[in-house]
């Protein structure tokens, strides 16, 4: 599993905090905005592309509020994404919604909270079962 991460200009500082946190946890991290800072649309599309390269990959996109990146990610067929600003939602969106990307706002989530959000997301496992009905419904929408 690789964690694909990207940020626009507003999210770069928080992205670096999250990237360091993930590397400390021995996760493979791919930074799509390491060499070129783009707007949230292009950054999100780059993250989605890499996440879709393997069923095991997860993605994290950071912009100022998390909403713009969320809107972009959910426009892509088959992508389930969630904008999160708390730990519980990050964990539950993996367990119940099988979200493969989360978006965060650098002006919403402080570094400590962001680390906890990331922990919940990457450690969460999809529960399947009764939740698959909703995931199938989401996938039919695109």
UniProtKB/Swiss-Prot annotation:
Pfam families reported for this sequence: LacAB_rpiB
GO BP, sorted A to Z: D-allose catabolic process; galactose catabolic process; lactose catabolic process via tagatose-6-phosphate; pentose-phosphate shunt, non-oxidative branch
Reactions listed under catalytic activity: aldehydo-D-galactose 6-phosphate = keto-D-tagatose 6-phosphate
Enzyme nomenclature, EC number: 5.3.1.26
Top-rank lineage group of the source organism: Bacteria
Molecular function in Gene Ontology: galactose-6-phosphate isomerase activity; ribose-5-phosphate isomerase activity
Keyword set includes Metal-binding: no
Keywords, in A-Z order: Isomerase, Lactose metabolism
Protein's pathway: Carbohydrate metabolism; D-galactose 6-phosphate degradation; D-tagatose 6-phosphate from D-galactose 6-phosphate: step 1/1
Family designation: Belongs to the LacAB/RpiB family.
PANTHER family in UniProt: GALACTOSE-6-PHOSPHATE ISOMERASE SUBUNIT LACA (PTHR30345:SF5), RIBOSE-5-PHOSPHATE ISOMERASE B (PTHR30345)
Complex formation: Heteromultimeric protein consisting of LacA and LacB.
Protein name (Swiss-Prot/TrEMBL): Galactose-6-phosphate isomerase subunit LacA 2
Source organism (scientific name): Streptococcus pyogenes serotype M1
Name of the encoding gene: lacA2
């Amino acid at each position: 599993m690789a964690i694909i991460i990207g940020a626009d200009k507003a999210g770069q500082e928080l992205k670096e905090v999250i990237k360091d946190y993930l590397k400390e946890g021995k996760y493979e991290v791919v930074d799509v905005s390491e060499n070129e800072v783009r707007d949230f649309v292009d950054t999100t599309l780059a993250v989605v592309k890499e996440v879709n390269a393997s069923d095991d990959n997860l993605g994290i996109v950071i912009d100022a509020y998390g909403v713009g990146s969320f809107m972009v990610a959910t426009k892509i067929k088959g992508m389930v994404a969630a904008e999160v600003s708390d730990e519980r939602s990050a964990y539950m969106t993996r367990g119940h919604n099988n979200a493969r990307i989360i978006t965060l706002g650098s002006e919403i989530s402080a570094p400590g909270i962001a680390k906890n959000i990331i922990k919940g997301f990457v450690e969460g496992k999809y529960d399947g079962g009764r939740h698959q009905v909703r995931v199938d419904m989401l996938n039919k929408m695109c």
